[in-house]
Design a protein with these regions (language model features):
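Class I S-adenosyl-L-methionine-dependent methyltransferase catalytic core
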Residues: 1-167
Length: 167
């Protein structure tokens, strides 16, 4: 049942061609659907959500597929790119390939430790990148957000408030 739902979502994405956006944006926050099976971890196709904490209910993309996303960015744009330990190095490359200069890393401390192979993970990262000369409102924001995790992949409310204050 779960795999059928995932296949339906994949087909809907392909049919509706969600990459054909005709606007350009000055602020973009993106949380790519990383394919953890690439890094020896979890995959939306391989795991049953009732038996594995890491299962996801959405289709994932490879690093190569994510890198090919046509980002609808204006000439002057701020990018917030969410990533995890497994894809941190790839994320720097993707940010650059999308035309953004790396500026900082925001760390989300989820308060309680999660899963991990070599070390129990408790944080997630958000790379801040600039394209051109975007307008930023002051520099009083901190590079760490401490807020408990919520539903899978849902980012902390403090992040959205920070983006609103900055941009």
């Amino acid at each position: 049942e779960r795999n059928k739902k995932i296949q339906e979502v994949k087909q809907k994405i392909e049919n509706e061609n969600l990459t054909s956006i005709d606007k350009k944006y000055h602020v973009i926050a993106i949380d790519p659907p990383w394919a953890y099976n690439e890094k020896g971890g979890f995959s939306s196709d391989d795991y049953d959500s009732q038996n594995n904490r890491g299962a996801v209910d959405y289709p994932t993309m490879t690093v190569e597929q994510i890198n090919k996303i046509n980002i609808p960015s204006a000439d002057d744009c701020v990018m917030f790119l969410w990533t995890t330990h497994a894809f941190l190095k790839d994320s720097f490359d993707i940010l650059k390939d999308w035309g953004f200069d790396y500026k900082a890393t925001i760390v989300w401390d989820k308060v309680k430790m999660g899963m991990g192979r070599n070390i129990r993970m408790q944080v997630e990262f958000c790379l801040l990148g600039f394209k051109g000369k975007p307008i930023i409102q002051g520099s009083s924001e901190r590079d760490i957000i401490t807020e408990p995790r919520r539903e899978h992949s849902r980012k902390p409310e403090a992040f959205y408030k920070m983006v609103e204050r900055m941009c």
